[in-house]
Amino acid sequence: MSKKSIFYLVFFSVLIVSFFFVLKSIIPGYGVRSFQVLSQVKPFTFTNQDGKLISEQNVQGKVYVAEYFFTSCTGICPILNTNMKGIYERYKDEPDFLILSHTCDPETDSVARIKQYADSLKVDNNKWIFLTGTKESLYNTARISYLLDDPKNNMENIKDQFLHTQFFALVDKNGKVRKKIYDGLKKNELKELENDIAVLLKEPATQTRFSNNLFAN
């Protein structure tokens, strides 16, 4: 092989490799294998800030981030939801993205109270959904579906328990929690979460959507 041929071979090899790395840096998820499935979200029914019932069927076909908070929290919750608002701002115009914020203090957080809280954040109620319900259902969903608290924690004497977590779960269009549980207080994990959302948004939904009591493709 001539020196000229070797030069062109090396040149185009470097060019191809460089092109791949450029794509990887500017396109979240490019070249990444499918994220592992951590759990399947179990059926749930909660009430949102507008007093409407929201179930797992209402969010089929959507990628969403799930978190837990309470409106009277003066510790980590304001920080978490400031960080969450950054995610909201990036994806608020994406039709297949939602945020689900569940209260961990339903005795205090009535529909009116979570509505007031949502309004204070100045967000679209159809994009960032705040949820309340029974303490047992909320805590069971956090532990069994979203893995945001140790699932081994006893569900007995639930009235004496208080779930307070800084973690976020990322759910795909088919109701599966994917890749990892993210620390909502760490900037590097928040950036990772933002990029992982973009990856899941490109994946197809394989389950039938359910909307207004009618199945739709």
Regions found by a protein language model. Give the residues of each.
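Thiol-based oxidoreductase modules, predominantly thioredoxin-like and allied folds used
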Residues: 96-109, 126-138
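Short active-site neighborhood of thiol/selenol oxidoreductases, capturing the structured segment around
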Residues: 55-84, 100
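N-terminal targeting signals for export/organelle localization
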Residues: 1-43, 210-217
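Short, internal strand/loop/helix patches
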Residues: 115-165
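A short beta-strand-turn-helix
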Residues: 44-63, 88-91
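Thiol-/selenol-based redox modules, centered on thioredoxin-like
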Residues: 154-217
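Short loop/turn microsegments at loop-to-beta-strand junctions
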Residues: 41-42, 64, 165-167
